[in-house]
Amino acid sequence: MATEKLRAVLDTNVPVAAYLSRNPRSPTKELIDRWRNEEFVQLYSDGTLAELKQKFAEKGIEPLLVDRYIADLLRIGVHVEFDPGDIEPVIPADPDDDLIVACAVAGGATHIVTYDPHFEVLGGEYKGIEVVDGLAFLRLVRGAVS
C-alpha cells in the first residue's frame, strides 16, 4: 500500500543552513539530499522563490550551488499559486513569514519546516499543517521511506 509523500514548505533558513554548514553530516544537508531523491515534496510559490534567491545572495552562497538548487526546485518542486489577498496575517513579528504559511495552506502542505522562532506563535500547527524544525522533519522523512 503506497502512502502519500510528505508535502512541505521549507522556510528559506533551511536550505541556507544546509549550504552554510561545514558539517558533512548536517541534518539540513541530508534533508536537501532526500528532497532531491524525491522522498518528500517541496512546495514553493513565486514569492518564496524570490525570497530564497534574496537570502542566498545575502548569505554569499556560491552562485553555482544556488543555480543548481533553484533549477532542481523548478524541476521537482511543486509550484503553488494563490491570490496575495488570501495571505492571512498570522506571524505578527515578521509579516514576510505569512507568505510561507500562505504557500503551505494553498499547496496542501503537511508541514512547514523552519528554524525561525517567529513561527512559535503558531504553537506547532496551523490549519492542520505541522510546524517543525529541520531535524524533526528529517526524522519524519527517514521514517516515511524506511
Listing of model-derived features with the role each one plays in the protein:
Residues 1-44:
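Short, well-structured N-terminal submotif of metal-dependent ribonuclease cores
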Residues 12, 46, 115-117:
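Short secondary-structure boundary segments
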Residues 33-87:
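PIN-domain endoribonuclease scaffold, especially VapC-family toxins
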Residues 34, 103, 123:
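Hydrophobic/aromatic ligand-binding patch that stacks against planar heteroaromatic rings
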Residues 110, 117-146:
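Acidic, PIN/NYN-like endoribonuclease modules and their adjacent C-terminal/linker elements
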